[in-house]
């Protein structure tokens, strides 16, 4: 968040948003966002184990009772044993305040945020249904605002796919270049390659890679050095 704040000060005309997963659900972070002049927006997925309450009611129960603002279809990419799928989710939102933890007497008593609750329709029919709670310092005034916050958070999946392409596809960790400058130069090339592959997942490989490159790629995947003929059948 502090690094994004530094960039935000360099481009005050642009709205930047720091996005965090459940490990970022920390009261002190929201307090910092409120107290930082010209701070970027903050969007964090809540950890359901946090015993946060609104008007003495568990916030997850409270948000589930709010009027549904609308529905949205999101794409859930493949991850491990989880298959890729599209899911329809219902969206609820409300302005609320995060109360400081009971064991924290040094922080301010509460921090205003907007909560966006996302729950999958017919979630009982899937093994891992979507149920998210997002807290954000960026105002949510209507369904379009809430939809945009959900899309911001869902964009993290694209970042994960990009990093996986860089790591597994480009094999950046296998580079043995001997110096930081060489690694940095190589990373600059591989990042562009990973970015182009990420944005062209449905294109036929011949539109991007030449026949020679495709042949070399197959040989490398098979563990044969360039120029090695394929094994002969007995």
Q: What does each model-identified segment do?
A:
Residues 1-234:
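Single, function-defining residue in the core of a domain
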């Amino acid at each position: 968040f502090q690094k994004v704040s530094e960039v935000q000060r360099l481009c005050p005309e642009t709205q930047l948003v720091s996005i965090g997963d459940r490990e970022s659900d920390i009261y002190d972070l929201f307090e910092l966002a409120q107290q930082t002049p010209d701070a970027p927006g903050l969007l964090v997925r809540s950890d359901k184990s946090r015993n946060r309450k609104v008007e003495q009611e568990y916030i997850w129960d409270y948000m589930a009772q709010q009027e549904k603002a609308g529905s949205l279809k999101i794409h859930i990419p493949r991850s491990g044993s989880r298959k890729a799928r599209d899911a329809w989710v219902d969206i609820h939102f409300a302005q609320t305040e995060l109360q400081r933890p009971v064991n924290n007497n040094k922080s301010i008593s509460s921090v205003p945020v907007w909560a966006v609750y996302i729950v999958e329709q017919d979630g009982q029919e899937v093994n891992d249904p979507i149920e998210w709670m997002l807290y954000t310092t960026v105002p949510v005034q209507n369904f379009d605002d809430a939809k945009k916050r959900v899309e911001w958070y869902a964009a993290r999946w694209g970042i994960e796919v990009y990093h996986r392409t860089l790591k597994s596809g480009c094999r950046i960790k296998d580079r043995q270049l001997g110096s930081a400058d060489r690694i940095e130069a190589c990373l600059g090339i591989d990042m562009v390659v990973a970015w182009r592959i990420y944005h062209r997942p449905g294109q036929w490989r011949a539109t991007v890679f030449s026949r020679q490159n495709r042949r070399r790629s197959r040989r490398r995947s098979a563990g044969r050095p360039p120029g090695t003929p394929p094994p002969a059948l007995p």
